[in-house]
Amino acid sequence: MQGLNPFHRDQGAGGRPAPVRPAPARPAPVAPRTPRKDPAPSRLAYRLNRMMLRPLVRRLVHVGLPAFLAALVAGIWLSDDTRRANLTGGIDAIVDRIQHRDEFMVKMMTIEGASPVVDKGLRAMLPVELPASSFEIDLEKLRERVLKLDAVETVDLRIKPGGVLSAVVTERVPVVLWRHARGIELLDKTGHRVASVTSREVRGDLPIIAGEGADRAAPEALALIDAAGPILPRLRGLERMGERRWDVVLDHGQRIKLPEDKALQALERAIALNGALHMLDRDISVVDLRQEARPVVRLGLEAQNAIRQARGQPELGPDGTPLAPEATAGNAAKAKKKSG
């Protein structure tokens, strides 16, 4: 058969080489196609995602649930009495060691401006004995207790470096004595009680006021005493009448009854009258100024009896009742004997 082919195997027409034809390539194996996932979520996932968009649900999941689990675990762990006692004891021991460190200890107390009685009372009010931890001393409560002392007006408490508890005390200054049914007490300028005394001679340098409610009107009483001026040497005190007004008590049993209002102005008028007329040097027992438009003067017993004798009337006794004629004659004889 080769002889029948005028061309060579490798030659084409005209003696040219025949083109080489590549063998067809075998197709590559095709991998099995995986089914595509449906991008749409399920109803449950959709609802969960929508719920997580709510702030309350997010906080509940991120904070509430972990906190609940932690509390549950802690509660189970602390349900055992032994573990709970050990934990409490350990915490108390740590706190005690910290509070009793040397830098927190108060070793001494200094008090300034207090009398010996107040100094002793203030030291007795300390809740603990020194040295003690500063955590055991509540300065605010201690200050409230100290201020309950009648003699203390103010107190400044502080813990200074070096473990020193400092107390600077300002005591009340007594300026007047107050006599009442329960005894005699010292009052300051505001009428606050300072201390009790057994008799007026303990503080004879102070003026005295008397009567129920006089302590509440002490500032007014002090103003009246300051205004007494010329009659101050004769002043024995002020008496509160009916918790409404004052009576100025002088020696020889004389009284100046002051009104409920404008008592200071009324006393100044009485002093002016006395300076002009020497009214209080006469036998007058009461000067009644309760009515501004109509002052009243009450004569003393001797002046009244002298007038009654001139009129031929029986004399009056100390209680204001007329005496018998015999007693009147006896008194007249005694008076004549004295004058002779």
Swiss-Prot record:
Bilayer topology annotation: Single-pass type II membrane protein
Gene3D superfamilies xrefs: Cell division protein FtsQ/DivIB (3.40.50.11690)
UniProt keywords, alphabetically: Cell cycle, Cell division, Cell inner membrane, Cell membrane, Membrane, Transmembrane, Transmembrane helix
Cell inner membrane in keyword set: yes
Transmembrane region(s): 56-78
CC terms in the record's Gene Ontology section: cell division site; plasma membrane
Localization (cell): Cell inner membrane
InterPro entries: Cell_div_FtsQ/DivIB_C, FtsQ, FtsQ_C_sf, POTRA
Biological processes annotated in GO: cell septum assembly; FtsZ-dependent cytokinesis
Pro residues composition bias: residue spans: 19-32
Region (Disordered): 1-41, 308-340
Stretches with biased composition (Low complexity): 324-333
Periplasmic side of membrane: 79-340
Pfam families in alphabetical order: FtsQ_DivIB_C
Residue ranges that the UniProt entry lists as topological domain Cytoplasmic: 1-55
POTRA domain segment(s): 104-172
Domain of life: Bacteria
Similarity field: Belongs to the FtsQ/DivIB family. FtsQ subfamily.
HAMAP family, A to Z: FtsQ_subfam
Protein's job: Essential cell division protein.
Protein name according to UniProt: Cell division protein FtsQ
Origin species: Paracoccus denitrificans (strain Pd 1222)
Gene of this entry: ftsQ
